Design a protein with these regions (language model features):
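Flexible, glycine-rich surface segments
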Residues: 153-220, 224
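Short solvent-exposed coil/turn linkers within tandem alpha-helical repeat scaffolds
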Residues: 45-49, 133-139, 181-192, 232-243
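Acidic/His-rich structured neighborhood in mature extracellular/periplasmic domains
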Residues: 56-179, 185
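TPR/TPR-like alpha-solenoid helical repeat scaffolds
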Residues: 78-115, 191-203, 245-255, 266-274
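A cross-kingdom marker for long, charged
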Residues: 203, 215-292
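Extracytoplasmic/periplasmic, Sec-exported soluble proteins
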Residues: 10-14, 24-31, 46, 50, ...
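N-terminal mature-domain "stem" immediately C-terminal to a signal peptide or N-terminal signal-anchor/transmembrane
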Residues: 1-67
Length: 292
């Protein structure tokens, strides 16, 4: 009776060979759309550890080549056509790009794992982590959580032109997600990037931005934001975010909610207690993380 011949699963050594082949292709600066497709083809059948390595190679490629991808979109005729589109940009708008060469350039950019964004009258590419999440079922739990964290920002950036462009609720959600990643996967190779994202979000939340200050009239913290802080401190008291929010609330209680004032020269300065909190926020947050 004839028997069916089964194809053996890929061995660790064959997986490693594929990873090295992919790494060589990335180092040779293959076009992003070709490289992303190669990654998906080569990842088929790979185990989580090997799949993670493919993602890391792809991310390193993006870090190296993002500026070059941006330069390809900087030609005046390209910018003019892209700025005519509705923003935020969606792929169904491709047909609205009149110039065929510009349309093909944008199609290749999107196929390479980028998405388009705009600020200060310029269009530029950003890495679309949501496209890397397409392979989320193949990678490890830690890598999938990392890609999900990074996709929050690539799906909807948190800040633009020194101003917060998401809600305080969404910012808190992202801050807690970044903290949770570091606490859950402290030894992950992606830990440092997640930690830096946590610090960035935490500073936005507790110190504001140039064009989104946390204070209003009389240099006092915005009442609605203080209420938000109080809710965060209670609901997330076991987190670093919640504990540092409580520390800020304690300071506000001693300053009458003031975070700044005018000195004798009429210059705006932070009150001493709040200034000390701002200056030490990053070091305190990092020190509270595991392995710091």
């Amino acid at each position: 009776m004839p028997t069916e011949t089964l194809t053996p699963p890929p061995s660790p050594s064959s997986d490693q060979t594929l990873i090295e082949q992919f790494r060589a292709k990335a180092l040779a600066d293959a076009p992003a759309h070709e490289l992303l497709q190669s990654m998906r083809d080569m990842m088929a059948g790979a185990g989580p550890a090997q799949a993670d390595e493919f993602i890391r190679v792809m991310e390193s490629y993006y870090e190296k080549n993002l500026n070059e991808a941006a330069e390809r979109l900087q030609a005046e005729n390209v910018q003019q056509q892209l700025l005519k589109l509705s923003w935020p940009f969606t792929e169904d708008q491709l047909t609205g790009i009149e110039d065929k060469s510009v349309r093909m350039l944008v199609e290749q950019t999107l196929a390479g794992g980028y998405k388009l964004d705009t600020a200060e009258g310029m269009v530029f590419p950003v890495v679309d982590y949501g496209k890397l999440l397409i392979n989320g079922e193949q990678v490890s739990t830690a890598m999938k959580a990392y890609l999900s964290l990074m996709a929050m920002e690539s799906d909807a950036r948190s800040a633009s032109d020194a101003a917060l462009v998401i809600t305080w609720d969404e910012l808190t959600k992202r801050t807690l997600a970044a903290e949770s990643y570091v606490m859950t996967f402290p030894d992950s190779p992606e830990r440092q990037k997640a930690e830096d994202r946590f610090i960035q979000y935490l500073q936005y939340y507790l110190t504001g931005m140039d064009n989104t200050p946390i204070f209003g009239t009389g240099y006092k913290v915005l009442p609605d934001l203080k209420t938000h802080y109080e809710q965060t401190a209670v609901a997330h008291s076991g987190t670093i975010t919640g504990q540092l929010t409580r520390e800020l609330l304690d300071i506000l209680n001693t300053t009458g909610d003031a975070v700044a004032a005018k000195n004798k020269n009429g210059d705006e300065v932070y009150v001493a207690e709040y200034a000390a909190f701002r200056d030490s926020l990053e070091s305190k947050a990092r020190a509270a993380l595991p392995g710091s």
